[in-house]
Regions:
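Aromatic- and Gly/Pro-rich donor/ligand-binding loops
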Residues: 2-140
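Short, structured coil segments at secondary-structure junctions
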Residues: 114, 144, 162-165
């Protein structure tokens, strides 16, 4: 919805195609991960091998994401070398450092490049208090944002109380 809105407003839109193993590995089945529960292991093995559950989910996601205008694929650790006038991040769990992993923080918090503007729209951290113990680091990154929009009242309050940053509430597109 956000991509279409930006296009209707006359902007050229590209989604940065970032491959994050922490995310993509959730589609891969890990045999016998429940050490003490043979029933769960057997159930998940059948689900994976016979029903191809993880494979179907990954293929659906790939088809969906390829509908959008993507940059070339970047890996964690790559320098994003494209010029953008504005960077926008947001939506489900984008600032949940437990999900994205520490090595990916600079990408999901837009700490790269030299855009004229940085904006978050409906950014979410779940219930994760990502800055605990690293307040100065995250305040430095988020202070580069021109506008911060979050989808959770918890996160709006957390940014204000912990990092002294103002955010507005924006609904998830």
């Amino acid at each position: 919805a956000l991509v279409e809105t930006f296009k209707r407003l006359g902007h050229e839109v590209k989604i940065i195609n970032l491959h994050n193993p922490r995310i993509s590995d959730t589609y891969i089945y890990h045999f016998w991960r429940h050490e003490n529960n043979m029933y769960l292991n057997l159930k998940e093995t059948i689900s994976c091998l016979i029903l191809r559950k993880g494979i179907k989910r990954e293929n659906c996601f790939k088809k969906f994401i390829n509908l959008f205008p993507l940059t070339r694929q970047y890996e964690i650790g790559d320098e994003i070398d494209e010029d953008f006038d504005c960077l926008v991040c947001g939506s489900d769990q984008v600032w949940n450092t437990k999900i994205i992993g520490e090595r990916a923080i600079s990408y999901y918090f837009l700490d790269f490049g030299h855009p004229l503007k940085r904006i978050s729209y409906a950014a979410s951290s779940g219930s994760n208090r990502f800055a605990d113990g690293n307040e100065n680091f995250f305040k430095g990154i988020l202070s580069k944002f021109n506008k911060i929009g979050v989808r959770e009242f918890f996160l709006k309050k957390y940014l204000h109380e912990s990092l002294d940053l103002d955010a507005c509430f924006t609904p998830d597109p």
